[in-house]
Each structure stands twice: as structure tokens, then as C-alpha cells.
UniProtKB/Swiss-Prot annotation:
InterPro entries per record: C1q_dom, Caprin, Caprin-1_C, Caprin-1_dimer, Tumour_necrosis_fac-like_dom
Start-end of Basic and acidic residues biased regions: 264-273, 370-392, 508-520
Entries under PROSITE patterns matching the protein: C1Q (PS50871)
Binding-site positions, Ca(2+) 1: 865
Name this protein carries in UniProt: Caprin-2
Species classification: Eukaryota, Metazoa, Chordata, Craniata, Vertebrata
Pfam families assigned: C1q, Caprin-1_C, Caprin-1_dimer
Binding site for Ca(2+) 2: 871
Keywords associated with the record: Calcium, Cell membrane, Cytoplasm, Differentiation, Growth regulation, Membrane, Metal-binding, Protein synthesis inhibitor, RNA-binding
Keyword Nucleotide-binding set for record: no
Length: 914
């Protein structure tokens, strides 16, 4: 009760409505760090400094301050009215009040009257202020418009004076002006000399003794004095007299139509005449050019159009220019799609097509590229056809033309071989002639003859593709899948029996080394586009290759191919000396035909293989196929999981066949492991040789089978059927652009969580292929960035736009926040979250806070209620930052309150990293 008496105690000489808010409120001690409003009467030195720096824009600012003061008065009177109403209610209920409270209740009607009067006064002053501000703004606009018009008129007058002075520099204009009776009265000879001197002062002529800037500055002073019309002397007269003379000349009308000088008119006529004469000559030359180049029509097969360079008529090409053109084309246009091109050989060598390497799954349908570029205009196209015809006549090029003499030899064997080669070239990626697999098993000699057709007429042919037939060759092109790497098997080696070949394991780069006999002929086949190192395989003859292949199938190395295969660093190294040195012999091959058949069948992307006995090997191929040129070698392939098509299904889970007695299944049963990456999905092979199905999942580690050579483990998402997962089963992705080539590999755990793991090297030990090797998977390290800073001292700069520094740091993960400058430096590109809360000092100046990214304002905060109270300005933002960006807070205007309770804070953290 004593406290209430203190709050409502009135001064005998003052009324309630005239009291200030500080006099009506008694503050109690809230603690050490609580903000306390100061009285406006007792201004500190800081507040006086801020008030002195505050700039008032105009009279409307004073009116706004008066309205704010009146608003606070009304609010205080309303509070007093509510207090008196409570006292009246207590008095009606019979409660006792002291003398001061009874006196205050007696003045209730006066307080209500004062409140009503104050509200009406506020409304009236507000409307008058709006009218006054509108009138003031209108007057300011009119004044500004008048100043603009005046400046425009002065500028126009200056340009007119400048034009008159420049025109008087011409002698013909001066003579014409003085000799004309109508204008001779405007100016005497003395006035003309004075104007000439004035023209030199205003810069009509360049004075090279001084700089251009100094000359124009002096001319500007002369123009200013001239437009003002002062009585200062200049050029034997005054500025006022000169201005009057110049205005008379401008108003005379003589300078409205001044004839051009004769020299300029003559130059214009001379420039027009050569243009009119040059036009008919250009037309005649164009007619001559078009008449000389009348092409003759000729049928050309664009699929096998030779690469020729467009040359001018009558120019002969050297015999080896086509090599330079071919190499330049390869460097300019790398092989990115399936294309067919043909290089033309001299008549001494036969045609041998060249095919660009098959690359990735860019498209499953092969396409051809027109080598002869077409133009948009008909005359140019005709000229190009004419040039192509002349080049074909000058160079011995093998072009397929109708009704041409047959180049086939008379020997029936060679004639048959060349016809089959021509059929393969015409068929392209489609196979119109199919062969039986049974014939190959029964007659290996015939099969080898069909597979390997040496190119007649040349011992070093240009290899376009392997002239081999496998089960993948028989299927149509519409069912081709993503091509794998080339098959280094005996069938391909037999076709390349002459000379040493270099085959790239990654991009199918085929070229032939020069032989001394071919160097004598003076013609070499150009190498195709090369991207990496090649795999050198020495092939002496067909029998050696067949014997070596049979020994490789039995696990015995061949001494004839003891060379090292060198590949790019990203590939795994392959040694042909003993590629199966750590693999147990699990099957035997009896007879040359069965070994050839198993080797010739190739490894297609969707192949399914099962070895049912130790004496026979059966091969089953699916509907899709891979071109035979890009089948990977057997040494590079490792069967990770089998997906047989026709197998029994057991009730307890999948059962896989081994060399003893194995039964597989073609579908998943309940509890079988599905999804996940390959090593997680495939079934585990026990050391005994049988397969076990995994019915549980353990994301902590995975089991991998040992490889026969160094291998970099890759992970893929497991999805789809067995045919779709066949590329993952063979673990060969050298020709396919996939996420496995990147640094991080997505790993699907099957539990709706995705981990990103780096590529790992699995150490290989000389042990059997059935050994299980645990490899632990760890996620990538997440970048930890977060900070939280506070300010414990007041901050009131005397100027605008000052950075805010923070003297207390709660958190600084990553050490990217600098307390001295208050700036956060972005360590990595990503999305960041920033939050700030700034408390305004209890003064009448509003608070403006800007969140800055480098020098750009991202978000802002404002705090002001029109009274000297504490207010908080806060905001937040989610920003996309790049590495090196700086984020900081800027105090645009106002002052910040700081205490040990840390009211002003600035925080931020990394949301996600790009």
C-alpha cells in the first residue's frame, strides 16, 4: 500500500496531465544488467553528442516530434484515467482510501475532459500538418523545376554563343556577313576583332601550350562571366557588351542557315562516285564466278564418303595431305558418338573401313555424319560439289559409284573374302547374315576362317573394327546395350596376324606399326584418335594365339605373350604373363573347338554363365548384346554374382551351383537380400566352394571377394532385374560414364538412408578367389562451422555506417569469426543461417542494423517507438555463400546498449555444404 501511495502522490502546483512519463513511473532495481530508461532532462555527454549529429531534414521533422510528444501525453492521461476508475470502484465497494487517493478521484472529470481535448488537438494538428507538408513539397518541386528550366536556358544560350563564335572562325562566313547589307549594321570591324579574341579565350582553337583540362577550365570561367553579363573587361570591351553583341547576332537569323564550305561538299560528291562505279564491277565478277563453277551431278554414298579438303580449282594436293586433314579432324572433333567413316587408300591397297571407338551410353542407335558440309545457299553448294568432283579425279580415292568397274580379284577365294568384307561394311551395326553356334563347335577350321578374314592387298590394314562373329553379333542393333571394352581373345587376335598391333584397353585405340616393306611403298595408315596408353600384344601367328588361349583357360601362362599391359593410372594394370596366378583351376577344357567356343562367345553385358561339369562349358546369352569390338577380356572380368535364367527355386532361399553340384534360382525368395550396393547384395561364397544367401544386413562392414589382380572397388546402386544389373555383376565400367568414376559413391543401405563413401583400394593377397575380405565403410567428414558472439559494452559511433565488433565469443567452430572486426569468413560454399538481436540504447535516436554480405545489404532491422526507451532490433536470413565471402553487421544509425547480460548477439552456422 505504501508503494501505491508513492506512485500516485501529486504535486500541489501541477496537474496529472502535465506530468512526464519519467515522473509518473518509479523504477525498481531490476539487477545488474537490466536496462534503465534515463530521463530526457538529464542527458549524458553521449546523448548530447548524438543529438548534435542528428540532422533534421526540414520543418516537417519538428512537427513530427511535436505529434509524438502529444501522443505520449495522451497515453499517460489514459493510464491515469484507468487508475482513477479503479479507485472509484474500490470506493463504491466500501474500501477505504487515503486522502491523496480521494483527492485524485475528485479530479476524474477533469482528467476525462483533458483526454478528450488532447485527442481532438492531435487530430486537428495531424490534418493541418498533412496539408502543410503537401504545400511545402509542392513548393519545393516548383522551385526545383524553375531552377532546372533556368539551367537549361543558360546551357542553350551558351551553346548558341559557342556556335556563333565557331562559325565566325571561317573567313567565308565573315565576308558574307560583312558584305550583306542586311547584317552589316549589327557589327563593326572593331567588334568583329573583339569577337575573334573572345573566341580564342573560350577555346574555339586548341592551345597546345597548356593541357586540355586547364584550357577548358579557363574557357568555363569566361563562359560563366559572359552569361552573367558582368562589367569586367575582356577583349577590349566588357562581358556585358559582348553578351549584347552576341545576342543580337543570334537573333539576326544569319546563323540559322550557314552554307557548308566548298571543300566538304566536293569530298561528299567524290565519295559517292566511286561507290556507284564499284557496283557493276562486283556484279560482273559475281556472274563470272558463278558461270565458271557449273557442277556435274554424281551419286555418292555418304556413308562411305572419303574425307577430302575443299581446295580451289586448279590446285593439286600432295599424296599425304589426307593424313594431316584426318589428324586435324580428330583433334578438332573427339569421338563422342557412334559414327562410321572411311579412309580411302591408293589402288595398291584395298579398302579397310575405320570406325571410331564406341563411347558410353550416349545413344543406342548408331548414326552417320555427313562429312561434306552443306551450305544455306545453292551456288555455294554447287561449288562444293564441283570441288569434291575435282578432288576425286585428282586423288585415287575409292568411292562407291554406280556402274563402276568391279575391283574384285579373279581368285574365287579372295573374291569371296572381299565380298564378305564388303557385306560387313554395308551392314554397319546391323547383322543381316547370321551364323549357327553349332557349326563353330563342329568345324573349328571353318569358324576360324569366317572369323578372321585378312584384308587382301595390304599387309598393314587400317583396322575399323574386329572382323569377328560372336553370339552378340547375331542380335539386331536395337537390342544393343552400353558397350564394354574390347575383347582380347583369340578370335580378335587371329584377324590381326600381320604386324604388331597396339590396342588401348580404355578407348579401343587401334593402329598398326610401320613395317620396313610398307615404308618402301611410301604410304602409312594414320593412327586413330588416341586418349591413353595402349596395351601392346605381340601376335605372331594364329596357332600360337590358339595354344596360348587354351593354356590360359587351364590356368597355365603362355610364354609367347609375356608382356605387361600398361594402362592409364586410373585403370588397373593387367599382366599377361600370368593373369590367373592366384585362381584355382575350377574347370578344364578338352579340345580346341570347345576352348575356342568358350573364348569366342565373349562376355556380353547381360551374359549368364554356369559351369555344370568339369568336362563341358555351356554358354547362355540374353536378348541384349554388346558390339563384339568392345567386349572386355576374360582376364579383366570377375563374376561377382550369378543370375541364371532357368534354375530351380528352393523354399529356404537361393541356392547357387558350384563345381560339385549346384542349383541356382532366377528369382528372389522371401528373406533374400535385395537392394544395396553390389558387394552388399551378392551372395557370399564360402571357402568350401558353395554359395550362401545373406538374409540379414550389417551396414557396419561388407564382404568382398579377392581379385586376381589389383582392383579399385566401386559401388553402385542395386536396382532392376538381373539383366539390368549385369554390368555391375561383371564390375567393368571403363566404357560407361557412371557415378563410380567420381570421388564419392552413393551407397544404398536398403533402409532409406544414403551414405556417401570415397573410393577405397582393397589390398590383394596371393590367395584363392573364395577368401572373404572385410572392408569397413565410413561416411565423409562433415564440415563443422558455427559461431555465436555477444557485446557487453555500449556502442555509439559519431558517424554513420560503422561495423559492429563483438567482445565476447560463446562458440566459434571452425575459427572463421573474427571478434575484432566482427566479420565471418565463409570457409566453403554452401547455405548458412545468420541471426542477430541488437538492443537500442535508451535515447530518442532510432536504431538501424544491416546484415551485410561483403558490401551488399542482405536484410535490415529497425527499432524505434518514438520515446527514449529500450527496443530490440532483430532479424535472420538464410544466405547462399561462396568461399571467401564475408558476413558482418553494420550500424547505420543509432546506438547499441551493451551489458554483462548480453542483450546484443550475433550468431550463424552452416546449414548444408555444396
Amino acid at each position: 500500500m505504501r508503494k501505491t501511495e508513492t506512485m500516485v502522490q501529486l504535486s500541489p502546483s501541477r496537474t496529472l496531465e502535465t506530468l512526464t512519463p519519467s515522473e509518473l513511473t518509479v523504477e525498481k532495481d531490476d539487477g545488474q544488467g537490466s536496462p534503465k530508461p534515463e530521463s530526457p532532462r538529464m542527458l549524458s555527454a553521449l546523448q548530447l553528442a548524438l543529438s548534435s549529429t542528428t540532422v533534421y531534414c526540414g520543418y516537417e521533422k519538428y512537427i513530427e516530434d511535436g505529434l509524438i510528444c502529444l501522443k505520449h501525453k495522451i497515453r499517460n492521461i489514459e493510464k491515469k484515467k484507468l487508475k482513477l476508475e479503479r479507485y472509484s470502484d474500490k470506493l463504491k465497494k466500501g474500501e477505504k482510501l487515503n486522502e491523496d487517493q480521494l483527492e485524485a478521484v475528485g479530479k476524474y472529470d477533469e482528467v476525462v475532459h483533458n483526454l478528450k481535448f488532447a485527442k481532438e488537438l492531435q487530430k486537428t494538428i495531424g490534418s493541418l500538418t498533412q496539408d502543410l507538408l503537401k504545400a511545402q513539397r509542392k513548393a519545393v518541386r516548383q522551385e526545383k523545376q524553375m531552377k532546372t528550366d533556368e539551367e537549361k536556358s543558360r546551357l542553350s544560350l551558351m551553346l548558341q554563343v559557342q556556335y556563333v563564335l565557331h562559325s565566325l572562325q571561317r573567313e567565308d562566313v565573315r565576308k558574307n556577313f560583312c558584305n550583306t547589307r542586311q547584317y552589316s549594321c549589327y557589327m563593326s570591324t572593331q567588334d568583329m576583332e573583339g569577337l575573334m579574341d573572345l573566341a580564342s579565350l573560350v577555346g574555339c582553337k586548341r592551345d597546345y601550350s597548356i593541357s586540355l583540362e586547364d584550357q577548358m577550365r579557363r574557357a568555363a570561367i569566361v563562359y560563366w562571366e559572359l552569361l552573367e553579363g558582368n562589367e569586367k573587361p575582356v577583349a577590349g570591351s566588357t562581358y556585358k557588351h559582348m553578351k549584347e553583341k552576341l545576342l543580337r547576332l543570334v537573333d539576326s537569323g544569319f546563323f540559322d542557315n550557314i552554307p557548308l564550305p566548298k571543300s566538304d561538299s566536293q569530298e561528299k560528291t567524290e565519295t559517292i562516285k566511286p561507290d556507284s562505279q564499284s557496283r557493276p564491277s562486283g556484279l560482273t565478277t559475281l556472274v563470272k564466278l558463278s558461270s565458271n563453277e557449273v557442277p556435274s551431278k554424281e551419286f555418292l554414298n555418304r556413308r562411305y564418303m572419303p574425307e577430302t579438303d575443299e581446295r580451289r580449282r586448279g590446285e593439286t594436293a600432295s599424296p599425304r595431305n589426307w593424313k594431316e586433314d584426318f589428324l586435324a579432324m580428330k583433334e578438332r572433333e573427339p569421338p563422342d558418338s557412334w559414327e562410321m567413316e572411311e579412309l580411302a587408300d591408293p589402288p595398291a591397297s584395298s579398302q579397310s573401313p575405320i570406325q571410331k571407338p564406341w563411347k558410353g551410353a550416349a545413344g543406342l542407335i548408331p548414326k552417320t555424319v555427313d562429312i561434306v558440309k552443306r551450305s544455306t545457299t545453292d551456288p555455294k553448294e554447287k561449288r562444293q560439289r564441283k570441288k569434291a568432283e575435282q578432288d576425286s579425279k585428282s586423288m585415287p580415292v575409292a568411292v562407291e559409284v554406280f556402274s563402276s568397274p568391279s575391283p574384285l580379284p579373279k581368285d574365287p577365294v579372295q573374291r569371296r573374302q572381299q565380298l564378305e568384307t564388303l557385306m560387313d561394311q554395308i551392314s554397319g551395326s546391323f547383322s543381316f547374315m547370321q551364323e549357327s553356334l553349332l557349326d563353330g563347335e563342329s568345324s573349328p577350321v571353318n569358324t576360324q576362317t569366317k572369323r578372321c578374314r585378312p584384308s587382301p592387298g595390304s599387309s598393314t590394314p587400317i583396322v575399323q573394327r574386329e572382323l569377328t562373329k560372336s553370339p552378340s553379333d547375331i542380335l539386331p542393333s536395337s537390342q544393343r546395350s552400353t558397350p564394354l571394352r574390347i575383347l582380347l581373345s583369340g578370335e580378335g587376335k587371329g584377324c590381326l596376324s600381320n604386324g604388331d598391333r597396339s590396342i588401348n584397353g580404355s578407348d579401343l585405340e587401334l593402329h598398326s606399326e610401320d613395317k620396313p616393306r610398307k615404308q618402301a611403298e611410301g604410304f602409312n595408315s594414320p593412327p586413330l584418335y588416341r586418349r591413353g596408353s595402349s596395351i601392346s600384344v605381340s601376335l605372331e601367328n594364329q596357332s600360337t594365339v590358339q595354344a596360348g588361349r587354351q593354356m590360359l583357360c587351364n590356368g597355365v601362362s603362355s610364354s609367347g605373350s609375356a608382356q605387361t599391359f600398361s594402362t592409364p593410372p586410373s585403370r588397373r594394370s593387367i599382366s599377361a604373363e600370368n593373369p590367373f596366378h592366384n585362381i584355382h583351376s575350377v574347370f578344364n577344357v578338352i579340345g580346341e573347338s570347345s576352348g575356342m567356343k568358350a573364348d569366342e562367345s565373349g562376355f556380353s553385358e547381360s551374359i549368364h554363365r554356369s559351369f555344370t561339369s568339369a568336362k563341358t562349358s555351356s554358354v547362355t546369352t540374353a536378348s541384349t548384346q554388346t558390339p563384339p569390338e568392345l567386349n572386355p577380356p576374360e582376364e579383366d572380368l570377375q563374376i561377382e554374382g550369378q543370375y541364371p535364367l532357368e534354375c530351380a527355386v528352393s523354399a529356404g532361399g537361393p541356392v547357387f551351383s558350384s563345381s560339385h553340384s549346384r542349383v541356382g534360382q532366377s528369382c528372389y525368395s522371401r528373406g533374400a537380400v535385395r537392394g544395396g550396393y553390389d558387394a552388399y547384395r551378392v551372395n557370399v561364397r564360402s571357402p568350401g566352394g558353395s554359395f550362401m544367401s545373406q538374409t540379414h544386413r550389417e551396414p557396419a562392414s561388407a564382404l568382398y571377394m579377392a581379385r586376381e589382380n589389383g582392383y579399385q572397388q566401386n559401388f553402385k546402386r542395386g536396382a532392376g532385374t538381373a539383366t539390368q544389373r549385369s554390368s555391375a555383376g561383371w564390375s567393368d565400367s571403363s566404357q560407361v560414364s557412371s557415378p563410380d568414376r567420381d570421388g564419392a559413391y552413393p551407397l544404398d543401405s536398403g533402409l532409406s538412408d544414403t551414405l556417401s563413401i570415397p573410393a577405397m583400394e582393397v589390398p590383394m593377397n596371393p590367395q584363392g578367389p573364395h577368401t572373404l575380405m572385410p572392408v569397413h565403410v565410413y561416411p565423409l567428414t562433415q564440415l563443422r562451422v558455427a559461431f555465436s558472439a555477444a557485446r557487453t559494452a555500449n556502442f555509439a559511433p559519431g558517424t554513420l555506417d560503422q561495423p559492429i565488433a563483438f567482445d565476447l565469443l560463446h562458440t566459434n567452430l571452425g575459427d572463421m569469426f573474427d571478434t575484432g572486426s566482427g566479420r565471418f569468413t565463409c570457409p566453403a560454399t554452401g547455405a548458412y543461417v545468420f541471426i542477430f538481436h541488437i538492443l537500442k540504447l535508451a535515447i530518442s535516436v532510432p536504431l538501424y542494423i544491416n546484415l551485410m554480405r561483403n558490401e551488399e545489404v542482405m536484410v535490415s532491422a529497425y527499432a524505434n517507438d518514438g520515446a527514449p526507451d529500450h527496443e530490440t532490433a532483430s532479424n535472420h536470413a538464410v544466405l547462399q555463400l561462396f568461399q571467401g565471402d564475408q558476413v558482418w553487421l553494420r550500424l547505420h544509425r543509432g546506438a547499441i546498449y551493451g551489458s554483462s547480460w548480453k542483450y546484443s548477439t550475433f550468431s550463424g552456422f552452416l546449414l548444408y555444404q555444396d
